[in-house]
Each structure stands twice: as structure tokens, then as C-alpha cells.
Amino acid sequence: MQEKLKILTIGDYESSTLENYFKDSKNIEFLELTLNEGIEKLNSKLFNREIVFLRSKEDNLEKLLEVGRALKEKEIITTTILEEKLVMENKEDLKKSIDAIFPVNKKGDIENLLLELLKMIDNIIFGLGFINLDIEDVKNMLKDSGITVFGSLNINKAISEEVIIKNINYNLNILEYLIKGYSFFLF
């Protein structure tokens, strides 16, 4: 079985650019969980060899934490992107429930940062390039990262794609120090 990156949407979520961007990808799978469903519904679709990206509206934080804890107990690596204010208010609960948390300055930036993060990780694991890591390497990085590996990245319409990519490439250099026992060249 090939490992995949999974995006688990909890509750209602508007139409997403993620689904459009990755609609033909064999490496990324989208899953949904309503607020009244338990994580057991997805037992046959989630494995500890995968990375699960959790996304939910701000008012569904309790369900996000519940799902995060359940997946963490199964040793499934979880990551999410939340508004910075929400992260700071719930720091301890989030650390106990989610492996890697990426705060953003504004709610509207969540989808953009998640898209860039998924593109980068998809390319690192499944793409052809300078960095050739398997999913276990990336899982180890995310498992040990806690709140924000990349720092807050404020994405708005005035920032060009080139600047965003430059920021992400710069932040890849930070990841180099998180990989224990590995040495490789980044850009």
C-alpha cells in the first residue's frame, strides 16, 4: 500500500482550492467527518504510515482537538493550520492533541498556507528534486515540531507567488536542522 497525505475536513467547509488543485493527485486523499460522527468511521481509511492534515472552522475547535487526540493515540501524525490568536488561547490543549501546528495571522490565510505546505510536502516525498525524503522522515520532522516550524506566514493578495515560494524555500532550510541523522543539500 502506498502512503498518502490525507486532508481530513471536520464539519462544514466551503468549497476549497485544495480539492481543485489536487483533484488528479494519487498521493493526496480528501476525507470528511461531520460534527456528530466519531473518528471510528474513518478507521479503515487512516493508517499510521500517513500524515493527516486537519482542517475545520474556528467554532469546531473542540471536535478538532478530539479528532487530533484520537489520531495521536493511534500514532498517526497530525498537523493543522489555525489563526494565531486561536493557537495562543489554546496552546496547551493543541500541543496535547496535534503534532504540528502552523499559526497564521488571519483566518483567510489558512487555505493558502495549507495549499503551499501540501505542495511542498507532496514534492519532498513524492516528487523528483533535490530533496528525496520518504514519508517517515517527514513524519519525524512534523512529530517533533510542535507549534510552528515555519513561523507565521502572512499571505495576502499583494504578495506574489514568487515571494511566497521564496519564504517557503527559506523555511525549508530551517527543516534541515530538524532532521536528526540526515544531511542533504537544500537549494
Predicted stretch roles:
Residues 1-187:
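Tubulin/FtsZ superfamily GTPase core signature
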